[in-house]
Amino acid sequence: VSATREPIVNFIMNKFGGTTEIKASESYIPTHKTIEKNYIITDIPEGYALYSYEENEHDNMTVWKNANGSILEFSQNLLSLSFSIDNKFNCKKLEINGYEAFYYTGENFACLVWTDGEYWFKVYGTADAEDYIMTAPYHIIEKN
């Protein structure tokens, strides 16, 4: 029997007008005040090239584009930050690695948001990248 405990992260969903805000519950004590480990996704679909990369102490974001103008975006955020989903989009709750995850789609995009218990991760892309987006948690690695 292990004497260690994994932190439990519960989420609160608040509806405000046309959006739903999702954030860690009030009882969650953040493990980080800044991003200490940067993550990236690998195995980007063929034809996509790096378009931009932004990084600061609270989040980072990488965007790839292909010749058709389709985009694929990966971001990492502190778990203490919240995010919002427009209520007009179809949102499904999933479970990834024992944590709640949120998958939503619109007319021409798909987005998956999940956590590892320390950070939020989001993969967003145009509809042609939907298959990759659903498998994104299996392509995440720590950046060297």
Outline where the language-model segments fall.
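Surface-exposed amphipathic alpha-helical segments
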Residues: G117, G125-N144
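Membrane-interface helical sensory segment of bacterial ECF anti-sigma factor regulators
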Residues: V1-E26
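Functionally constrained cores in energy, signaling, and assembly domains
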Residues: K15, Q76, T135-P137
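Short, solvent-exposed recognition patches
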Residues: S27-C111, T115-D116, W120
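Compositionally biased, low-hydrophobicity segments enriched in charged and small polar residues
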Residues: V1, Y39-T42, H139-I140
